[in-house]
């Protein structure tokens, strides 16, 4: 199919490119992993495994990591965990928030990521309402930030024709767009 051809093209990019695969825990991500497993990894794929702070999030991340290890030749270098919705960017704080990743010496934990990987690569992702909005809208924060729609102009046009409710809606989306840009520039790009 066309999607498999697109996936093949990504995998076969030259050495000057790295493919970043954000591996979620849904059916689509399982299908993508199954397809990549059929052809293998060529060393240019970086696997990002999202991880929330819940127990089930940890179990899903471990299962996903195990699938990727069967595909990836160099998992220590190419698997990276995104610690999603970190309440604070303070290292001590997110170390305790993500017990499913780091474990805790005083709390009994079944199995955590650090039980399977000696020094896992990771980065915390600060929680923000734009992340919640991105999930509801089915877009990444980056896509929301750099959407080319001029919501301000649309709001003015709607107001000029007397459609105040549409004008409010466009202002709402303009606000989200602005907040997403701020998040990308001031949080993600740091």
Please annotate each region the language model reported.
Residues 78-80, 85-190:
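C-terminal lobe/tail of nucleotide-utilizing enzymes
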């Amino acid at each position: 199919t066309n999607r498999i051809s697109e996936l093949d093209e990504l995998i076969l990019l030259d050495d000057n490119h790295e493919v970043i695969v954000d591996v979620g825990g849904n059916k689509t991500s399982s299908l993508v992993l199954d397809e990549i497993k059929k052809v293998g990894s060529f060393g240019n794929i970086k696997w990002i495994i999202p991880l929330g702070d819940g127990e089930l999030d940890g179990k899903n991340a471990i299962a996903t990591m195990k699938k990727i290890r069967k595909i990836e030749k160099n998992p220590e270098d190419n698997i990276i965990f995104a610690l999603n919705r970190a309440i604070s960017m303070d290292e001590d704080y997110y170390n305790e928030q993500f017990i499913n990743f780091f474990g805790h010496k005083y709390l009994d934990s079944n199995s955590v990521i650090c039980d399977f990987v000696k020094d896992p690569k990771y980065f915390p992702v600060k929680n923000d309402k734009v992340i919640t909005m991105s999930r509801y809208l089915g877009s990444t924060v980056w896509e929301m930030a750099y959407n080319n729609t001029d919501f301000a102009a649309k709001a003015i046009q709607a107001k000029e024709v007397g459609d105040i409710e549409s004008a409010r809606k466009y202002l709402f989306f303009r606000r989200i767009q602005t907040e997403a840009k701020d998040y990308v520039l001031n949080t993600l790009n740091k």
